[in-house]
Amino acid sequence: MASERPREPDGEDSIKLSADVKPFVPKFAGLNVAWSESSETRVFPGCAATYYPFVQEPPAAEQKMYPEDMAFGAPTFPAQYVSSEIALHPFAYPTYTLESAQSVCSVPTLQYDYSQARCHPGFRTAKPRHEHVCPPPQEAKGVFKKKPSDERRACEEQKSSSRRADNAVPCEARPARGSSHLSSRTESSLKSDGYHKRPDRKSRILAKSASTSKPEFEFSRLDFPELQSPKNSNMPETQKPPRWGPLGPAASNMPLLGDVGKPVADMVEGKMVKSDHTDGAVTSNATTSSPSCTQELSWTPMGYIVRQTVSSDSAAATENVTSMINLKKTTSSADAKNVSVTSEALSSNPSYNREKRVYPAPKAKASQGGELEQNESSKKNKKKKEKSKPSYEVLTVQEPPRIEDAEEFPNLSVASERRHRGQSPKLHSKQQTQNEFKTSGKKSQVPVQLDLGGMLAALEKQQQQQHASHAKPSSRPVVFSVGAVPVLSKDASSSERGRRSSQMKTPHNPLDSSAPLMKKGKQREIPKAKKPTSLKKIILKERQERMQQRLQESAVSLTVASDDSQDVESGASNQTPSQDNPTGPEKTEESVSSTPVVEGESEEPAGTEFQRDPEACQPAPDSATFPKIHSRRFRDYCSQMLSKEVDACVTGLLKELVRFQDRMYQKDPVKAKTKRRLVLGLREVLKHLKLRKLKCIIISPNCEKTQSKGGLDDTLHTIIDCACEQNIPFVFALNRKALGRSLNKAVPVSIVGIFSYDGAQDQFHKMVELTMAARQAYKTMLETMRQEQAGEPGPQSPPSPPMQDPIPSTEEGTLPSTGEEPHYIEIWKKHLEAYSQRALELEDSLEASTSQMMNLNL
């Protein structure tokens, strides 16, 4: 510290501090000063006279003020940027400037004066001073602009009065008067009671801390040899920027700012600045003892800047003369930002370099005291208002972003306006209650209940009412499906449609065209009538021809007389040939009756048919002499005798195969399609017969007679020929209706084809054995009939068994009618001869296979 260094006795070159005197620190000096030593030159400030009574204070120099800059500054500068000199020299400015500035917060400031020891051998004392600077409100700006001439007159009067005072007062009194003038604000503030009661707690705390410390100061010119060097006498004084502040482009233009409640003390080239508000920057200047050393005060929108310049004739001006005070309480980041902004603004604006000399007057104290008292009272009211304002909680409502494309998106703008209205302060209480309700976690106390059963019951009742109003209620229940389209019940009138749908659901066998097709896509409610096939057309044509023939026969029978005499004559004529040839009709009846004895009792229905045929053919004389074997129920395409055993065996076989097929369809419909057991119909049987997929054929013996080309008879002959070629057994059994019933069909069936008889082999083999026996009997019957027709019967012929009697009778009966046999009979004879050999071979193979199976079973 400076107190520990050796003291120099030079009264002129150094300033000595008495060690016996303790420094006096004012109560409200909101600054704790700490000096740091360096190699740079240190000049004792003018404020040292305040603390030490024997310190000489140099006379005050001239100050340059810029009131016109303050009045005619930037039009947008805030009202709080007001010069501190207005409060310093109230007599130099109009009265309205101070009156308008009473409602602004005060800024306490310490004044420091630079002095040179060699000019003043004695010491003088001074009091610490504080000042309250109140920047004018917004109204003051207009007043400053209105009266610039009055300000100039006041400045000229101040200059003249100051010059007269300087000439009358000795050199020793000048620094005291200057210092008292510069520190008049602080002195008046100490005298006023309002200042002691101001609510500045931070300044009180700083003042107490400063009063407890007792620093000792000692400065010597020998410690600063740069001041004594002659080369520095003509060099201008340069400034060193403060260590805490930013370095601007012009180091001399450093604004000194502070926040409210945070006093800041800075020492920059003889200027001590303390500010309590960021908006008002107050600078107080104490010029050096040299009359050629001047300080300039320039105003900017951000504050005032004080410059210190040294003229060329000043011999005591040194290079890098700077005195600094290290602050224990540093400024905040906001102060640093304000300083940097102000320095940059000043350096870039050359319009504020104009100078005007303002000389202080001794009348400043009296006028300033009254003004400052008014300022303090107004300040108290202002601070009370400012303190009372934050007690009210202000709700800031953030406006939503405005949508520029309101025309393109009208919905967004409307939604934002609604949200903005909803967030008004009036609804703030409602929003709080809603938030509390949300935080409670209970969204709704009443749970949502859905009764699907009740909904379905209501729907069912409604549909029943609709059906009752429109149509008769159906016996079937209404079916509903949850989550899908409801399936409505069908009426009785749609039974046919249901039957078609059931047929549609049956699978289709791709290998069998007779299988029901799977219907896809749209269907007609009334299906379109199928076109009849060529076979069906032929059958229908013959039916019409037969009907017409019957109509003609009925018409002819009506023309014939129905007298009894004619009947007697016709009966006598019929008896005479019977008496002449007693073996004729009687033997035919015996032959017909004897055939069941050979074939079996099952052929009795066939015998009855044969008996009916001659009766039907009685009107024809020629037909009576020709024995009738075939009839409508036993057609001429049959090559075997009919028997009940064969019919029973065929019925059992077909039922078993149908059962197997249905069981397979229930297990696996796809597999049942590919592995069918049976096929029905003339076309399907012929198709699969040509494909060599059938193993057996069952034909009904009572098919309709159609002798035209391409008719039913030709189709049957084609099927039989194919079966003979492929050595496939074909059986004539049952009639069309019985064959349909054995297949569980409601329609008559003419022919059935068997794909596979697996599982019913025993029944199949038995059927084949019975069929071979019936075919053999049919052959013997035809041979006997030929013999009877070929030779004449003799009366001496011994009685023969029933099998032999019909043969000569038939041969005798057929001899006269050999030339009248139809063509198909000759074809059948050839087929029988060819088939007889194959049938014998088949019988031998069947006997061998049965014997082998018996051996295996044993």
Curated annotation (Swiss-Prot):
Pfam families: Ribosomal_L7Ae (PF01248). SUPFAM superfamilies: L30e-like. A motif (Nuclear localization signal) lies at residues 380-387. Keywords: Cytoplasm, Nucleus, Protein biosynthesis, RNA-binding. InterPro entries: Ribosomal_eL30-like_sf, Ribosomal_eL8/eL30/eS12/Gad45, SECISBP2. It comes from the Eukaryota. Residues 418-429 have a biased composition (Basic residues). The keyword Cytoplasm applies. GO terms for biological process: forebrain neuron development; mRNA stabilization; negative regulation of nuclear-transcribed mRNA catabolic process, nonsense-mediated decay; RNA catabolic process; selenocysteine incorporation; striatum development; translation. It is found in: Cytoplasm; Nucleus. One of its GO terms (molecular function) is ribonucleoprotein complex binding. Transmembrane segments: none annotated. Residues 281-296, 327-352, 430-447, 554-563, 571-582 have a biased composition (Polar residues). One of its GO terms (cellular component) is nucleoplasm. Residues 147-166, 188-197, 215-224, 539-548 have a biased composition (Basic and acidic residues). Disruption phenotype: Embryonic lethality: embryos implant but die before gastrulation. Conditional deletion in hepatocytes significantly reduces the abundance of many, but not all, selenoprotein mRNAs. Conditional deletion in neurons leads striatal neuronal loss leading to coordination defects: defects are caused by reduced cerebral expression of selenoproteins. Residues 795-805 have a biased composition (Pro residues). Residues 678-699 are annotated as: RNA-binding. Residues 127-261, 275-296, 327-625, 785-819 are annotated as: Disordered. mRNA-binding protein that binds to the SECIS (selenocysteine insertion sequence) element present in the 3'-UTR of mRNAs encoding selenoproteins and facilitates the incorporation of the rare amino acid selenocysteine. Insertion of selenocysteine at UGA codons is mediated by SECISBP2 and EEFSEC: SECISBP2 (1) specifically binds the SECIS sequence once the 80S ribosome encounters an in-frame UGA codon and (2) contacts the RPS27A/eS31 of the 40S ribosome before ribosome stalling. This is Selenocysteine insertion sequence-binding protein 2. The gene is Secisbp2.
